[in-house]
Amino acid sequence: MENGQPSLTALTATAARAAHLIVDHEPLIFADSLALALLGDRAGELVSYHELHAAHPVLAGARTQVTCRARYTEDSLARAAGRGVTQYVILGAGLDSFAYRTPHAGGLRVFEVDHPATQDWKRRALAAAKVAVPDGVTFVPADLAADSPAGPLAAAGFDAAAPALVSWLGVTMYLTQGAVGETLAAIGGFAPGTEVIADYMLPEDMRDEAGAVYGTLVAQASAERGEPWLSFFAPGEMTDLARRSGFGSVRNVRQRQTIPAALWRRADALRPADLAVLFHATVTAPSRAGENLAKAHPPAGAKDGETGVSTARRARC
């Protein structure tokens, strides 16, 4: 990652969201109206690949993956907000645009946790597009590849005693299984009712043909740019890991299940694949590991005995 620039992973994910509005047919899966603007002067270059090769399995697969996971997460967030949840944590926020284009974002405190270089680039892109940063948005700079964001999040005012929705997308495959477990244990220390939505990659023997083709090509490209995939999980493994981390309600959602069935009746190249699965779990009893991290990082101004946030050890921007 270069100073003042986001990672290529963040750029390509944003380009896929932007291209969905340009090259794919109705019905749209997800409408990110700011993705193109956030790409800045890289927009033409990155989106042109999709325009020229819309049906290529890697490009069509990327658009399918990023739009389905974003749609599912933001639909879940809307339901959580309707139940009174007021905190939204985006681990590895990248160029996520939720807080700048969504009407109900005004009732939420949004904590965008990411590498300072990505956040600097994003601030400049927002300014260039004349998009104001809402009062409820807090940028939490953290080198998520090396350090725990627990301290920065606590200092930013996250209330670990109140439930939140935690989005952790496009990250776990770049972490070891041990690091993923540490992250889940940390999130499991949040208040009961907290939800986490993350995606993970299936092992090769659990992928269908489309998932195998896309996974092989993208894993190779990721490794070549220095961001190799390091972990893969069977759904049962993720469920067991979650149960040990304080999560009661656990769902593993296949890509086909992430959006309404009617949206798969399409005339473009977007098709569901068995490669990435969405993990959606709810904290019922805070994990001991998470509680210990929370105690180690009380929020700014907290009195003795009050606890703060605990969250992911590492993430990719």
Language-model features: locations:
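A short acidic, Gly/Pro-enriched loop at the edge of an enzyme's catalytic core
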Residues: 151-165
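Conserved beta-strand signature within the Rossmann-like core of class I S-adenosyl-L-methionine
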Residues: 190-204
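Acceptor-substrate binding/catalytic loop of class I
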Residues: 175, 221-235
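A short, conserved alpha-helix within the catalytic core of class I
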Residues: 149, 174-187
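A short SAM/SAH-binding and catalytic strip from SAM-dependent methyltransferases
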Residues: 163-178
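Core SAM-dependent methyltransferase catalytic element
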Residues: 262-289, 317
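Short alpha-helix
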Residues: 229-255
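Rossmann-like AdoMet
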Residues: 1-89, 93-140, 147, 160, ...
